[in-house]
Amino acid sequence: MGGDFSKSGREQAMYHYAVSDVLPVLLHLQDEFRQSAFSPYCTELQITPGNPDFPPICLKTRDGHTVRLIGKIDRVDICRDGAQKWVRVVDYKTGEKVFSLGHLLYGLDMQMLIYLFSILSEGTALSDAQPAGVLYLPAGKVKSDQKRGASKTPEKKRNETYQMNGVLLRDAHLLTLMEQNGEGIYVPGKLDAKGELDTKKGTFLTQEQMRNLRKYVLEQLVDMAERVYHGEIDALPLELPKEDPCKFCAFSNICGNSELCRQRIPYGDSRMQEKKMMEILEELAEEENN
């Protein structure tokens, strides 16, 4: 895209449109990293058989099939805190994305967790690190819904637009490593007046829950693989509020369910789903202890 030679008017307009969208994101990232103990370890990190530092996790189904978990991570951040090494993965989203622990019941919102657990597995370059969390960073246009008479600064509007969401380790000190003052400007969590983690302002898991979540996610992947190998690939999307599962599907005209006459109905509301997921993690902890 260098220079203006041979560019059409449309190409130039698209280029300037992209640049105008990127600049606010870069300014926000600059502000965040200026005050954070975390820094980028790698961008576009490949988890493939050809990468000796980060080979894929290999899982075995009960009937002998092998499943390899490959992919690419937008960004991996690292923080060295004394003898401890923390790692978090960040995914850039041009659209709206809100992580829900309850979605894991249905195999959703697992991709970034799979990546996190993969790069921390035995035999990788980060096997000596601990998981700090998974974060989704909105990377679209700055919100322009400010009401008449409002006095928000451009910086505040930018921070509101690009505040990350996701799941973090339940650790107040770790939160201050991500965000020095713990105000919840950049990450989905904040400290209360006593300097303790405000668990109502985000999704947090203990180290034990994070370990059991890894076990749950990998078990779900094996179960999915077994169902696919056995031919269970029905066009039966999950019914979710404000989401059309067929919106970007290239096969909606041949699946036989393009009108969504058949859908999976989720268990209760989002709060009930999250509660159910936490109960599953508790059950896995009891199994491990017994």
Regions found by a protein language model. Give the residues of each.
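Structural signature of nuclease core domains in nucleic-acid processing machines
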Residues: 1-290
